[in-house]
């Protein structure tokens, strides 16, 4: 919201340009935000398994992806390593100061129609245990200004306790595709915690996220 006001001031116009984050960063950062608020996040190691729909149309050639995993998505790793730091950063003197988080990402294209899965390990500033982290994730809520908007995810984060969840086919439409689903929260022997994040890339990460942004701008009398 502060960036919209600053943009109008800088450009001397009444409109605004609002961009969505990368569809992988969108869901991942929701989970990181909850943990960062509670414990502080110092380091993130993330491996994405990204759906075919994220490649757009006409997408990935069928003979390239059938019976296969493509271990590189051009330009994606750089986005996933940078965008969450911006989203978790602070507005300061007309710009965003990036969050002080060290980030490493691998991005992979997999033969899934919709739903990006990210396997995440984090190092925290303040130690915690998996059960407490699960409770923090489960109780996380949107900013007060966004909680009652029509597209606001309900819940923001759903925590699954099954050993084999979340899965794209089973969980991507949770909260009409706007909820971020987290599972397999456990201790990490190298960092502190590890877990799996699933979000619907074309709903939460694209069209639904755009509508959510527009609703927020209307509610704040910026449109």
Residue ranges with predicted function:
Residues 1-72, 102, 126, 180-181, ...:
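N-terminal Rossmann-like NAD(P) cofactor-binding subdomain of oxidoreductases
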Residues 42-192:
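C-terminal substrate-binding/catalytic lobe of Rossmann-fold NAD(P)-dependent oxidoreductases
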Residues 77, 203-207:
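Short, charged, low-complexity patches
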Residues 108-112, 199-204:
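Glycine-rich phosphate/pyrophosphate-binding beta-alpha loops
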Residues 27, 129, 205-206:
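Secondary-structure boundary/capping motif
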Residues 194-198:
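Low-complexity, intrinsically disordered segments enriched in Ser/Thr together with acidic residues
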């Amino acid at each position: 919201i502060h960036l919209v006001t600053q943009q109008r001031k800088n450009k001397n116009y009444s409109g605004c340009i609002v961009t969505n984050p990368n569809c992988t960063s969108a869901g991942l950062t929701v989970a990181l935000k909850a943990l960062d608020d509670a414990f502080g996040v110092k380091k993130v190691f993330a491996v994405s398994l990204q759906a075919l729909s994220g490649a757009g149309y006409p997408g990935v050639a069928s003979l390239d992806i059938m019976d296969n995993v493509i271990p590189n998505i051009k330009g994606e790793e750089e986005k996933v390593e940078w965008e969450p730091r911006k989203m978790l950063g602070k507005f300061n003197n007309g710009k965003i100061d990036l969050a002080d988080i060290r980030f490493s990402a691998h991005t992979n294209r997999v033969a899934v129609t919709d739903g990006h899965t990210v396997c995440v390990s984090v190092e925290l500033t303040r130690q915690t245990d998996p059960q407490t982290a699960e409770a923090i994730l489960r109780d996380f809520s949107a900013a007060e200004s966004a909680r009652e908007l029509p597209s606001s995810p309900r819940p923001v984060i759903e925590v699954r306790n099954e050993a084999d969840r979340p899965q794209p086919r089973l969980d991507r439409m949770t909260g009409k595709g706007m909820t971020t689903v987290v599972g397999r929260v456990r201790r990490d022997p190298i960092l502190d915690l590890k877990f799996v994040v699933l979000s619907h890339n074309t709903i939460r990460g694209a069209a639904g996220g755009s509508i959510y942004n527009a609703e927020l701008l209307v509610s704040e009398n910026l449109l």
